[in-house]
Amino acid sequence: MKQVDVIVVGAGQAGCAAAYDLASAGLSVLMLDSHAATGHKPCAGGVTEKARRLYRFPLDSVVRETVSQMQMSLYQKLETPFTADTPFCLMTHRPELDQLCRDQAQQAGASLTIVRHVSGFHSHGDGIVLTVDGEQIGARYLIGADGAHGAVRRLAFGGGARHGAMAIEGLLSREHCNRYPQTTFDFGAVRGGYGWLFPKGDHVNVGLYIRTQTGGKVDRHALADYARQRLGSDALTHVQGFPLGTWGHKQRLAAGRVLLVGDAAGFTEPLLGEGIYGAVLSGQRAAAAILAGNDVAADYIADIDRWRSELRRVHPIAAIFYTTLPISFGVLKHGVRRPLMTGYANGLTLVQSKRLFFGARFQ
């Protein structure tokens, strides 16, 4: 039976972040992934400034747009520019971003195996054994970075699929667009959520996001309608729907030698569905706990608690925002626009921006 120090199931942003740090420290790391074979994983690909600061290596080679201004609208009307003095987001194409991170993790010493199915798991005193495509692999630790519907959470902790939020996206070639948009958020484009337009040079990433508690619906027809309304064409390719894990404030994150990170841990921010920051952060924190070698599960839970507290505070904000959109958009537009954008450009989270600028003179 093959034996390694750490198995990381999932070679996306969370998994690669963990694998990079672990392998850089000299541990033997095996990444297992199915999406890496196809090269496309659903994700809008926006890397916020707070996320960019976490990476151990430059992202320049995969940056398609640098964003310091975006448009926000209510029901596709009342378009309002939101501007920061410095860039607050980098637009990447997710397959290219993932490939860069996999390459960096492998250069650090991690190995990658493309798999079809993780079907079994059991733990023992010195580690875990994972059954993958009918074969067993042993490790001292297991990191589940395989998404909101991932196998590791179900096998190690039980419970079925969870739906904190849903999104659907597609790519529209620039030649099919009647205009090339700025980065755009259209609140109310779908009930209980928003539509987005993320320009990427040769194409625009078009998507819809909803919080599932609101009863809204996203599907191919809704996405095609939105693309026609905003860009004059529904010639979308690579259309994919996907669940987002937004339950990290109450998810069981670790037990013994198993740690959950990224969407598998529910670390996506629920207001806008931004998941890359929580993914990279949790992957790095999981690696740090393993490298410290003490009470790994307890150390990881304690170390990631600040982000869990952020998520806990954002949930009621998101609920109020989407259920009172005409009022909340007005507050966003006339009240917190400037401090929010300044905070994001300085790498702050939503709650940190609120704390820093509470009582400031708003634009």
Model-derived regions, located:
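C-terminal helical "tail/cap" subdomain of flavin- and related membrane-associated enzymes
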Residues: 288-363
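Beta1/beta-strand and adjacent pyrophosphate-binding region of the FAD-binding site
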Residues: 1-14
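Predominantly flavin-linked oxidoreductase catalytic cores and closely associated redox partners
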Residues: 11, 104-233, 250, 266
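A conserved beta-strand/loop capping segment in the N-terminal third of enzymes
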Residues: 49-100
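FAD/FMN-dependent oxidoreductases across multiple families
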Residues: 120, 214-289, 294-295
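Glycine-rich FAD pyrophosphate-binding loop
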Residues: 20-42
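Generic enzyme active-site microenvironment
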Residues: 31, 144, 261
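Hydrophobic anchor at the start of a short beta-strand
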Residues: 6, 28-29, 142
